[in-house]
Amino acid sequence: MMIYLKLSAKVIMNSYKNVYILGIGGTGMSSIAKYMSQAGFNVGGYDQRKSYITNTLEQESINIDFDLEEITYDKDTLYIYSTAFNLTKTNLSSNTESKNVLSRPEFLQELTRDNYVIGVTGTHGKTSTTALLAHIFHYNKRNVSYIFGGVTSFNGIGGHYGSDNKVLILEADEAFDTFNSLHIDDLLVTNIDEDHLDYYLNFENLINAFKNVIENTSNNVVLNLDNLELKKLKLSKKIYSYSSSDESEITIINSGVISHEGTNFQIETSMIGDHFKSNIAGAICIAYLNGISIEDSLLAIKHFSGVRRRAEFLGSTSGISIYDDYGHHPTEIDVTITALKIHVKGKLYVVFQPHRYTRTQEHLDKFKMSLLKADEAIVVDIYPSGELPIPGVSSKNLEDKNIKYIKSMRAVPSYLRGKVNSGDAVLTIGAGDITLLGPQILKYLDEKN
């Protein structure tokens, strides 16, 4: 679905001094807040609760309200709201047609019209790959702007307004067909997998949405041809690729070696999992097309420590390691469990919080198959993310051999205490508030051991 233009980025930059962001605590909205703040705007916002992200933004002099009654409409303020935010709860609901009230996709559409945009999309891996690409550019003294929905060690929240402000590296989200409303000059596609089918209705529609954004990209397109759906696409556009085939511009020899034009290059990285090596190959390819040598990219990658909540190591106590991950799709859970099991000496315990009733219903059997790869899995109640419950859809439906349902996250630390031993690891995984659980488990085990 295309989004109609309200005003251009030049008008935004020249007409407003104040920006107010609704849902500012989310990773996607906080990156816009940081970008706009660095661009010279007075930025404020609203969120339901305090978090690591809101605390970080407040430390950067961004004022945040936690009471809806604090929000009042001002014609001289630009409002940007998350698609997950319910505007009807505010007095802005009657102003949604106003030029100064934009959804996140509408804002990004305007922003991409006046920049050279390097977009990164794909069902899986787009946040990590966008962050890696931004790091490669910055490590090589290319101070470009970027917006992505994650937190990194190299620059915190994933938003930056660079001195080379005509180039924007952007995570291009396929949800709600957002990426097809953007103007993209260079595009990297990591993969296509079944997701967001509550919106697209079927997989074919999702594939066609990816095909459209590829065909409409102005310049370079880089595809992962190890992904079957990308490989099957019939395209009129010239593409560059990375894959395990020597027909690609970047060939993945194994998990630690890539090749280009007959020369092999060693990858040195702290990131866990073969899927990250694939993302690295894609980032190297599109950086190369933008004038950064493979050697210079690899040097940057060596100093990249990843994105928060991507197989993130939180700490250990009594030989028990705790990890946290954002994965909320069966494929993401599968690859993360597989990667960690290689590194864990003992047993791997996984605590999963399903994200949205529609996704849980859609992928129930696949979630089970992924979770059964752990030595033991625990599932807690579904994180709704603004959705209403669907009758008959519950985390309890995921119970199986070695998959235990525990309704409340608060009961998980004490349950695990009776299970885990030195050498074991615990992975908390999901896109909701389960990210709060890992530190609680670590603290509980530390106090009780």
Regions inferred by a protein language model and the residue ranges of each:
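Phosphate-binding loop of NTP-binding sites
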Residues: 4, 8-17, 21, 35-41, ...
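Nucleotide phosphate-binding/pyrophosphate-handling subdomain across enzymes
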Residues: 10-18, 28, 35-39, 263-376
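Conserved N-terminal Rossmann-fold NAD(P)-binding element of oxidoreductases
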Residues: 19-24, 429
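NAD(P)-binding Rossmann-fold cofactor-contacting core
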Residues: 42-56
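Conserved beta-strand positions in the Rossmann-like core of class I SAM-dependent methyltransferases
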Residues: 44-45, 145, 378
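Beta-strand->loop->alpha-helix junctions that form or flank phosphate-binding loops
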Residues: 46-47, 65-69, 102-106, 147-149, ...
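Short acidic low-complexity segments
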Residues: 63-75, 408-416
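C-terminal helical cap/extension that packs against the catalytic core
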Residues: 367-422
